[in-house]
């Protein structure tokens, strides 16, 4: 059995854009995406709403294998104590190696470092692996929007989860 090595987690840089865009396209699935599959020409991964500093990336053997996006859920000052996970992706080759868990733990630590008191996320109801992972890291279901999305002709719940920091 190979020795476990935790991924190296760091803040994204503009130089990561191409790899992140490819990872995002390669991991697209109706298990977690509510937008259509990306088609060329592909939009920029980073833009005025999606800045490199919003992303933590995971590397194994110096290869980018995952990311998590940590952002404000709203622009309201009254909500500034909350951060939200707004994207998590792990390459197929790195699944089952603890990359997703390491990214979630790094996001929790980073949200705390930035002064957040709560961390929230939304996950599709049929994404059982992600829901189990989030629950194992202390997230609880805080609300469900039944049948919020229609994906491939099937109505899917939108599940709000959160945890105190």
Question: Where are the language model's segments positioned?
Answer:
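Short hydrophobic/aromatic beta-strand or adjacent loop that forms the aromatic wall/cage
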Residues: 53, 156-160
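Glycine-rich phosphate-binding loop
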Residues: 94, 98
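Acetyl-CoA-dependent GNAT
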Residues: 2-7, 11-17, 22-93, 104-106, ...
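Conserved beta-strand-loop-alpha-helix junction that forms the acyl-donor binding cleft
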Residues: 121-131, 147-154
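Conserved active-site alpha-helix within GNAT-family acetyltransferase domains
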Residues: 101, 126-143
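Conserved GNAT acetyl-CoA-binding A-motif
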Residues: 111-122
């Amino acid at each position: 059995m190979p020795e476990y090595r935790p991924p190296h987690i760091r803040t994204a840089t503009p130089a990561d854009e191409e790899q992140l865009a490819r990872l995002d396209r390669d991991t697209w699935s109706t298990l977690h995406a509510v937008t259509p599959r990306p088609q060329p020409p592909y939009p920029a991964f980073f833009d005025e709403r999606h800045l490199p500093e919003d992303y933590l990336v995971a590397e194994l053997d110096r290869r980018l294998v995952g990311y998590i996006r940590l952002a404000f859920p709203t622009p309201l000052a009254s909500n500034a104590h909350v951060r939200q996970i707004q994207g998590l992706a792990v390459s197929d080759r790195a699944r089952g190696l603890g990359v997703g868990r390491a990214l979630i733990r790094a996001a929790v630590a980073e949200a705390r470092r930035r002064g957040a008191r709560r961390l929230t996320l939304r996950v599709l109801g049929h994404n059982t692996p992600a829901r189990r992972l989030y629950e194992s890291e202390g997230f609880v279901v805080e609300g469900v929007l039944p049948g919020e999305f229609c994906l491939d002709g099937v109505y899917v719940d939108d599940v709000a989860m959160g945890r105190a920091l």
